[in-house]
């Protein structure tokens, strides 16, 4: 039995190219970084990393563009979508929205003495960094905005507006390729760290609001179902959940 015709967001060519770049990213950066194999490494890359980052960000912006309230910002995002689509289908490097960044992140890279953070919030931050997915348009100041997509241990950024060139979005990825020196890499002292902290606090507040809406009977059923899942309890995820007070 054969499946019906498959729909492609960008067309068959671009989806096939994305699949190849995704495999390269997974094998050369994602898995080695998660295994702490890149702390002192230098990783050479060609155009595949730039293509992969834009492809990921294009998908995020396509799904979120209708929720952008600011008409001027939305207009810029529509242009970015068009430029990225053309590039992903074999066109030139985007002429306007071409500042693409990758930000690997883990506990060691996030740890900071700038904020007096309670231990239970640090655990939530680590959960966010190591496990969570997220996306949004980050607005540091009125004229500093960037789209981001977060997967476990990585942020991808595309600059939409930028006045402050000191903002640290991580590693600038070149469309011509280059080399990443992980030994010298850091995510700066403030800015993004403060953003992550506030993002986690906002999520905790939303979760607390949702938790209050659940009846005690519903909560008991959820807890009983979770406690009987031995596989979850004995897993790395289960350990992290217990540390966060969610099991």
Segments the model singles out, each with a brief description of its role:
Residues 1-21, 34:
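An N-terminal structural lobe/cap that precedes and organizes the functional/catalytic core
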Residues 8, 12-14, 52-60, 150-152, ...:
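Structured loops at beta-to-helix junctions and adjacent beta-edge loops in soluble globular domains
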Residues 17-20, 50-89:
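Short flanking/linker segments adjacent to small metal-binding domains or redox-active Cys/His motifs
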Residues 21-29:
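Short cysteine/histidine-rich zinc-coordinating motifs and their immediately flanking basic loops
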Residues 29, 34-36, 67, 71, ...:
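Generic alpha-helical propensity signal that fires on short helical segments
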Residues 31-48:
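Short microdomains enriched in Cys/His and/or Lys/Arg
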Residues 74-247:
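C-terminal, charged low-complexity interaction regions
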């Amino acid at each position: 039995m054969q499946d019906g015709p498959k729909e492609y967001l960008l067309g068959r060519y671009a989806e096939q190219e994305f699949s190849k770049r995704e495999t390269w990213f997974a094998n050369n950066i994602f898995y080695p970084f998660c295994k702490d194999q890149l702390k002192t490494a230098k990783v050479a890359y060609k155009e595949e990393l730039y293509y992969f980052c834009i492809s990921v960000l294009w998908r995020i912006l396509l799904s979120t563009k209708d929720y952008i309230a600011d008409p001027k910002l939305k207009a810029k995002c529509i242009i970015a979508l068009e430029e990225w689509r053309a590039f992903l289908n074999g066109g030139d490097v985007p002429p306007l929205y071409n500042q693409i960044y990758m930000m690997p992140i883990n506990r060691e890279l996030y740890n900071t003495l700038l904020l007096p953070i309670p231990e239970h919030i640090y655990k939530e931050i680590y959960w966010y960094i190591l496990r969570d997915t997220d996306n949004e348009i980050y607005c540091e100041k009125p004229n500093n905005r960037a789209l981001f997509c977060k997967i476990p241990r990585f942020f991808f950024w595309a600059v939409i507006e930028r006045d402050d060139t000191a903002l640290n979005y991580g590693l600038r990825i070149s469309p011509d390729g280059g080399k990443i020196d992980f030994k010298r890499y850091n995510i700066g002292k403030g800015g993004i760290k403060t953003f992550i902290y506030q993002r986690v606090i906002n999520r905790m507040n939303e979760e607390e609001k949702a938790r209050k809406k659940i009846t005690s009977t519903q909560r008991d059923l959820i807890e009983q179902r979770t406690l009987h899942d031995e596989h979850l309890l004995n897993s790395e995820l289960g350990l992290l959940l217990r540390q966060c007070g969610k099991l």
